[in-house]
């Protein structure tokens, strides 16, 4: 007869498996570590997750995470409103900000096109992006999606649609490696890719 772990522990393992890159064994190791060695850390993690889910929302303008209706970047009068940079995730936005080479505004897709996974234009908030880019203020849209197959397909789809509306559309230069995700690329490489962006 095999021994089953307590249901509370099994639920914790299952919840941890929802995290990207965490499989069953990793989830089990994390759960046991938290319960054996870091209960205080586990409680802090639980409180932080609850606080984040209760207080974080999407910015009404750019779709990134914020605690207010409109994020700090969108409220910043020093930003250039004629430039709109499209990224896949808030983590990509933060990486671009760390380069200190871009002073425009953003739109965060919260994903990328992936028909096999059921992610189409609606899931990446395409209509909101088009409305934002077509506000009469934006002059250039910088496509900073990742250089993965899905990121390239997303950039192509967005580029074709936005160019048809008379907008100048540029793409980050290839300083970012093929298959590379912005979140994992150093700030210097991203800065060079932003400065050397090309017209689509």
UniProtKB/Swiss-Prot annotation:
GO aspect biological process, one term: DNA repair
Domain Toprim: 82-177
Annotated keywords: DNA damage, DNA recombination, DNA repair, Metal-binding, Zinc, Zinc-finger
Descriptive protein name: Recombination protein RecR
Disulfide bonds: none
A molecular-function term among this protein's GO annotations: DNA binding
Protein species of origin: Burkholderia thailandensis (strain ATCC 700388 / DSM 13276 / CCUG 48851 / CIP 106301 / E264)
InterPro entries: DNA_Rcmb_RecR, Rcmb_RecR, Rcmb_RecR_Znf, TOPRIM_dom, TOPRIM_RecR
Zn-finger (C4-type) residues: 59-74
Family: Belongs to the RecR family.
Coiled coil start-end: none
Role summary: May play a role in DNA repair. It seems to be involved in an RecBC-independent recombinational process of DNA repair. It may act with RecF and RecO.
Domain of life, source organism: Bacteria
């Amino acid at each position: 007869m095999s021994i089953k772990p307590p249901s509370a522990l099994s639920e914790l393992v299952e919840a941890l498996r929802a995290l990207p890159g965490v499989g069953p064994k990793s989830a089990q190791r994390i759960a046991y570590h938290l319960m054996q060695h870091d209960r205080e850390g586990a409680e802090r993690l639980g409180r932080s997750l609850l606080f984040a889910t209760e207080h974080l929302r999407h910015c009404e303008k750019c779709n990134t995470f914020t605690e207010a209706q409109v994020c700090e970047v969108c409220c910043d009068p020093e930003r250039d409103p004629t430039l709109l940079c499209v990224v896949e995730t808030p983590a990509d936005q933060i990486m671009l900000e760390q380069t200190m080479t871009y002073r425009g505004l953003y739109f965060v897709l919260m994903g990328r096109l992936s028909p096999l996974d059921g992610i189409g234009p609606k899931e990446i908030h395409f209509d909101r992006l088009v409305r934002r880019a077509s506000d009469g203020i934006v002059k250039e849209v910088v496509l900073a999606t990742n250089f993965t197959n899905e990121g390239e397909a997303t950039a192509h789809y967005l580029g074709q649609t936005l160019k048809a509306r008379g907008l100048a559309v540029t793409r980050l230069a290839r300083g970012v490696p093929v298959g590379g995700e912005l979140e994992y690329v150093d700030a210097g490489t991203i800065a060079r890719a932003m400065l050397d962006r090309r017209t689509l």
